Amino acid sequence: IVFRAAQTRSDIEIVAINDLLDAEYMAYMLKYDSTHGRFDGTVEVKDGHLVVNGKKIRVTAEKDPANLKWNEVGVDVVAEATGIFLTDETARKHITAGAKKVVLTGPSKDDTPMFVKGANFDKYNGQDIVSNASCTTNCLAPLAKVINDNFGIIEGLMTTVHATTATQKTVDGPSHKDWRGGRGAAQNIIPSSTGAAKAVGKVLPELNGKLTGMAFRVPTPNVSVVDLTVRLEKAASYEDIKKAIKAAAEGEMKGVLGYTEDDVVSTDFNGEVCTSVFDAKAGIALNDNFVKLV
């Protein structure tokens, strides 16, 4: 998905990929995607290299990032997407190998700073290793920031109705650390834990300790929903809240936070470029200090 997204950008060039898969299989997985459809472009393998839209891409299969010799292909930024090297110590091996910057595509497991567009990206100060947090945190944080900046959040709970992920089972199977997680993904709604709400406190320190949450894994292939229920410091009607979010979506958070009043469902957001889209018709208010936002 990172690769496909990069193909839409004129300012990003993919020059190398490191994966334990062979090049032929990588080409196949890029060409065909059950959720996002066929790749819009040419994909082939020549002399062990991946060639996409006529551009040659170096392919390696190193287990140790320190051996990747990123300097040989002029790498500026590495997208560390294995889910394995999530600390400064392990991710720094990419720097040792010649890369200038590393972006972790998941939450860091140490104090490596996390940055989320629409939340705290303005605090980025040139750090060479950063985390982009999780998909759920990217959805929640921009909305939480708008609400807190305008009305103040006393406390809140988040529930994410989360699409199936690759680690789930097609049918019941052993899962020693998470018994429920071992149940068939296509057959069940599975309660699960998530650190996404607490992670918001890392990117927005003013909300630290004020939010927590949980997840339900549901049998859909893509697109997840965040349900944020909060108590507000400053009383506000639901219409006031909608206006504040719409103003942010059309202003300083344009391209990150979206806003819709259409009667949408999850598949309408397949391939959505905004990290968070507020569904104005789906939320409700109990009173002017207690609201549920979707």
Swiss-Prot record:
Homotetramer. It comes from the Bacteria. GO terms for biological process: glucose metabolic process; glycolytic process. GO terms for molecular function: glyceraldehyde-3-phosphate dehydrogenase (NAD+) (phosphorylating) activity; NAD binding; NADP binding. PROSITE patterns: GAPDH. The keyword NAD applies. Its EC number is 1.2.1.12. Pfam families: Gp_dh_C, Gp_dh_N. Transmembrane segments: none annotated. D-glyceraldehyde 3-phosphate binds at residues 134-136, 165, 194-195, 217. Keywords: Cytoplasm, Glycolysis, NAD, Nucleotide-binding, Oxidoreductase. Belongs to the glyceraldehyde-3-phosphate dehydrogenase family. NAD(+) binds at residues 19, 63, 105. Catalyzes the oxidative phosphorylation of glyceraldehyde 3-phosphate (G3P) to 1,3-bisphosphoglycerate (BPG) using the cofactor NAD. The first reaction step involves the formation of a hemiacetal intermediate between G3P and a cysteine residue, and this hemiacetal intermediate is then oxidized to a thioester, with concomitant reduction of NAD to NADH. The reduced NADH is then exchanged with the second NAD, and the thioester is attacked by a nucleophilic inorganic phosphate to produce BPG. The active site is at residue 135. SMART domains: Gp_dh_N (SM00846). Its main location: cytoplasm. The gene is gap. This is Glyceraldehyde-3-phosphate dehydrogenase. It is an enzyme of class 1 (oxidoreductase). The keyword DNA damage does not apply. Pathway: Carbohydrate degradation; glycolysis; pyruvate from D-glyceraldehyde 3-phosphate: step 1/5. GO terms for cellular component: cytoplasm. It comes from Atlantibacter hermannii.
